[in-house]
């Protein structure tokens, strides 16, 4: 699977992801880019789950952003509705972590859109490890959002067999 982590702190929101792609018990690729910018670079997003499924969802989410003039929450809710009700989309297996200058959200295939209380998102197989590391760093250091994401991904990469230490990181400043 993968690890995606997002942290919001001091006017910065960052999403980072590892690069490992596995097929069964074989590592197929180590430098996949699972985080990208959307909607005129105003939204950042990362995915955990099937790569082809995630690219389909990125495309659909970007269309929703265009339709709703970049309103992140509205676009996320509309994507989640479609994902839950459309027969073809229901078969897609992925999670999205998305953020803009105002909100950080998790979008699931069950039709859930979750905004975490503490603006910390960690999804994928290494998510619990990255979340624990990020929470400890948020509560006990003055590190910036990018440093916390980098360190959390590194820790998850050391622990989770489906996560590696290759990192793709995107950041928005607001």
Curated annotation (Swiss-Prot):
Cysteine pairings via disulfide bonds: none
Molecular function terms from GO: metal ion binding; threonine-type endopeptidase activity
The entry's keywords: Allosteric enzyme, Cytoplasm, Hydrolase, Metal-binding, Protease, Sodium, Threonine protease
Reaction(s) the record says it catalyses: ATP-dependent cleavage of peptide bonds with broad specificity
Any one GO cellular component localisation term in the record: proteasome core complex
Location in the cell: Cytoplasm
Known regulation of activity: Allosterically activated by HslU binding.
Keyword Transferase assigned: no
PROSITE patterns the UniProt entry points to: PROTEASOME_BETA_2
E.C. designation(s): 3.4.25.2
InterPro entries: ATP-dep_Prtase_HsIV_su, Ntn_hydrolases_N, Proteasome_sua/b, Proteasome_suB-type
Catalytic residues of the enzyme: 2
Primary localisation category: cytoplasm
Pfam families: Proteasome
HAMAP family: HslV
Subunit structure: A double ring-shaped homohexamer of HslV is capped on each side by a ring-shaped HslU homohexamer. The assembly of the HslU/HslV complex is dependent on binding of ATP.
Family membership: Belongs to the peptidase T1B family. HslV subfamily.
Protein's name in the database: ATP-dependent protease subunit HslV
Native source organism of the sequence: Yersinia pestis
Gene name of the record: hslV
